[in-house]
């Protein structure tokens, strides 16, 4: 017995329309972005010789710049360290006030979350520029900018970690009449301590990188020296500085990654 082969039913219309619409939006955003930013592969290709010529000016390296780099580099690390330390301390109350299972009032929770979102919407370089206008030039504006960045990011990550904990210990503490502070200290902190330490180490890595450019707006650190070298077209010293920063960041990244692998 023979007959026509069975045919599959056509796919639903709505998913197809959603797929076509998504690709259309993606293409429209790409074209609009390329147009308004003057993105051009031809211009990029024409700039490749200049790219290599620029890096060619960095050779041979001028190692006489090494004595000048030590102090600003140390200042950069100090900015990142202090900013991470004070930012971490400042984030603690926001972590618990912004977590659904540890805050006392939903209004407070949403208020804290909204405030943190608002703070995170401003980049750390802009905070540094604002702080330079208020506190004058030097590393202090850089520290303040890093504190604000660290507190806002750590509070966000921390509140999400708190909401993902096992509720059992909290419920047990509530059953025996423990207060909210006691619940946090004995029921929440032991569960999030390792993860939060890992976050702090990771944010310190980010802050070291961020601190290297804060000097461009006068907020201290090695960025000021980098700006000076570029202003005087001293590319050979610039190359030495970049190599030193690269090595330090790699070292911190390796140590931090090892420490975080032991924590989690």
Each model region followed by its residue ranges:
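N-terminal, non-cleaved signal-anchor transmembrane helix
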Residues: 1-85, 92-93, 97, 101, ...
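C-terminal transmembrane helix and the adjacent membrane-cytosol boundary/short C-terminal tail
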Residues: 12, 18-22, 239-264
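Hydrophobic positions within alpha-helical transmembrane segments of bacterial inner-membrane proteins
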Residues: 84-92, 96, 100, 125, ...
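Cytoplasmic-entry segments and transmembrane alpha-helices of multi-pass inner-membrane transporters
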Residues: 94-128, 157-160
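Generic hydrophobic transmembrane alpha-helix motif, especially the helices
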Residues: 116-150
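Glycine-rich helix-loop "coupling/hinge" segments at transmembrane-helix boundaries
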Residues: 133, 208-245, 264
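Membrane-cytosol interface at the C-terminal ends of specific transmembrane alpha-helices
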Residues: 138-188, 194-203, 254
